[in-house]
Amino acid sequence: MIYLDNAATTMHKPQVVIDAVCGAMTSFGGPGRGSHQAALDASMAVFGARQAVSDLLDAWGAGSVSFALNATMALNIAIDGLLPAGGVAVTTAASHNSVLRPLNRARDERGCQVRVAAILPDGSLDWESYERALVGASLVVATHASNVTGDVYDIERMAAFARKAGALFVLDAAQTAGAWAFSASGIGADVVCFTGHKSLYGPQDTGGLCVRPGLDIAPLVEGGSGVHSFDERHPRFMPEALEAGTANAHGLAGLAAGCCWLAERGVADVQAHIEGLVTRFLDGVADIDGVQVLGGGSGQRCGIVAVNVGDADSGEIADRLAQGWGVCVRPGAHCAPLMHTALGTQQQGVVRFSFGAMNSQRDCDDALSALRDIACP
């Protein structure tokens, strides 16, 4: 198997992550739910995961990190808790449905206005469209990198424009956390949403949001918190404000291990490794007749390359890659409908190759060989 579907989830995890999860499952009690050793061990693991995430992403400290099931839930928490009824929200056509659908719900149920800044056919942001959309905005929710084409956007500039317009800025870092070197506390964002199961190499059902100190986000879910149990409503102090119920301590032990593994390697070095594979793949694709590369207009690309082979359906190409050569990729719309409208690929979709820290040059070359055999039989 040649696994090149890392943008969906990283399948090959570091052994330290596997060991951490297995160890937690045989020794942890309920985090924040007792004073016996099993409960204390679980509580320390959750705190350790907060610290590991904050250290790796250069956030605002362990207390700024609230956990959720994934980036989708984190984005729902941020949008629901920060966008006032009747407010104006801005996003871009590169956004995933984890942004678009919560915003559309706010439009339909709370009278909010949703403005979408255009993405050009080459995958780059239409800056004039973005600036026009910001007038009177309350909240901006933007993706750091397109999960379709891999285009990486100038988030510092986007956040600066939002701040000038008086809007809060929420960053969807699902595709970049752990794979692209950036400072969560230094890019101008108020909230950075991340997932654990992609480039942080943690288990599925881990993720969360890093919140700027002093920012009050209304809880999306209320319930048991382990503290202030006689209060009628959920605590409003971080990080407990955005968490309810028993934490996934087993998964968070794995997430912490993944973050520590990345810290030892260095995110900048991981990024350089992935960029090298992407460059190698793009160079190879350029020599294959009939293969079109989508996007790239932003000038920076994360570990994602989207292609199409002539007018063939992307699902057919992905099936042939998997069945004939064991190359695992993802076809279709990738839950980002407006990006496909911008690219003109609504019907065909795209074949998405996505590289990670565990991939090698041989993986890249074998995938190119398979693609060449399909395109040029």
Indicate residue ranges for each PLM-predicted region.
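Pyridoxal 5′-phosphate
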Residues: 1-377
